[in-house]
Amino acid sequence: MNTVDWTPETLVADIEDLVTLPEVALRIASMVDDPTSSAAAIGREICNDAALTARLLRVANSPAFGQDGKIATVSRAITVLGVRQVRDLTVGITAIRTFDGIANELVTMESFWRQSVLCALAAGHIAARRQGGRNESPFVAGLLHDIGQLVLFNRAPELARQALLMSIYAADEPGLYRCEREVMGFDHGIVGVRLAQKWGLPRVLQECIQFHHEPSEAKEYPIEVATIHMADTVAVLAEIGSTDLRDGPAISPMALRALKLDHATLAEIVLQTQESAEGMLPLLTGAPMAVPALAAVQVL
């Protein structure tokens, strides 16, 4: 296909055979939405996939969920975390597995998922401190927020590279999503939400994926989208080892107002994110996770 013919819909349709969400995740998502399905039946469905079960239990027992080895079975995970949280973790884990075999020339899967995991952890910490909103799967929303980038990297690598280089070298630092719009007419958020819709992901995840760069555009879940928007900046700071907010992407004033978190609290969340990051990526992907040590806390 000629590059000028790409649209978010054709990109997702073109890659669908390569990144179809595994049947186990689709079945579990359907069962969670079915009022006649029991927690026990959902647990049995998960247990049919031994690799998924093992990874789910490792993640559920991680510091990110505060269980400290207390969850020994899938049924216990459902009881403690709830069926929707377990469903969303299942989607996140299987999505990582799905994309692991997808080639691209612009970024390694390890670096992509490392940044995504940092965003997921930051989102959880922000959700625990913010005022308002529902605790709608902040971890998984953070994990999947940039999934549209992987579609672009794989299906339209030349256009994605052009946008990436523009974002790096532009004097006014416009941000990758704006450069994607200039090059392609759309950004990775809309590509990601088209994939999320194909997968039947919950509406809250769709909004977080689509609007995480522009939280003021969120319709149904503005607090949750603002959380992922802010977590994106916290993840960058955790990655580079800084608590100075000037070192990361600017946080929307709307998000700061909506979440009611000051700069000192955000600096603490950067530290929390770093502390909880080590060991999380291996749980999800098997790859090691290393983040730089932070210098002295520097708060605006």
Enumerate the language-model features and the residues they cover:
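Terminal helices and disordered tails flanking the catalytic cores of nucleotide-processing hydrolases
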Residues: M1-T10, P253-L300
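Conserved alpha-helical "signature site"
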Residues: M1-L164, I168, D172-P253, A293-L294
